[in-house]
C-alpha cells in the first residue's frame, strides 16, 4: 500500500514545522521531559497546536479529561515571552510554553 502524500519526506521537509512546547505547572504531568514536540503544517494556529496536544492526551493518557481541561484553559506563550491567542499563526519553527491557570483560593 502506498504511503499517504503527507507522510513523504518531501512534504515533511517543506511543509511541516517542528514545534516544541515547554511544560509548566500541571502540564508537566504530560511528559517525563520538560517539553513536548509536535509537527504542524505551515501557517497553523495556536488552536491547531492546542488540538494536537489534546490528541496527544487522547492517545497517551486514554483521554484524561483533567489533562484536556488543562490544555483548553491554558495560555500559550511565545519564545519572546508574549501571550499568544488561539488565532496566532505559526509561520516558522517556533518554541512555545503552555501556562496552565494557577489554582488556589
Model-derived features with residue positions:
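Ubiquitin-like/PB1-type beta-grasp interaction modules and other compact soluble beta-rich domains
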Residues: 2-104
Amino acid at each position: 500500500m502506498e504511503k499517504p502524500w503527507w507522510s513523504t519526506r518531501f512534504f515533511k521537509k517543506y511543509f511541516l514545522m517542528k514545534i516544541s512546547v515547554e511544560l509548566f505547572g500541571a502540564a508537566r504531568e504530560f511528559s517525563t521531559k520538560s517539553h513536548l514536540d509536535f509537527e504542524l503544517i505551515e501557517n497553523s494556529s495556536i488552536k491547531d497546536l492546542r488540538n494536537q496536544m489534546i490528541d496527544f492526551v487522547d492517545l497517551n493518557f486514554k483521554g484524561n479529561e483533567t489533562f484536556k481541561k488543562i490544555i483548553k484553559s491554558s495560555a500559550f506563550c511565545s519564545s519572546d515571552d508574549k501571550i499568544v491567542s488561539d488565532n496566532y499563526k505559526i509561520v516558522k519553527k517556533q518554541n512555545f510554553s503552555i501556562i496552565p491557570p494557577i489554582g488556589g483560593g
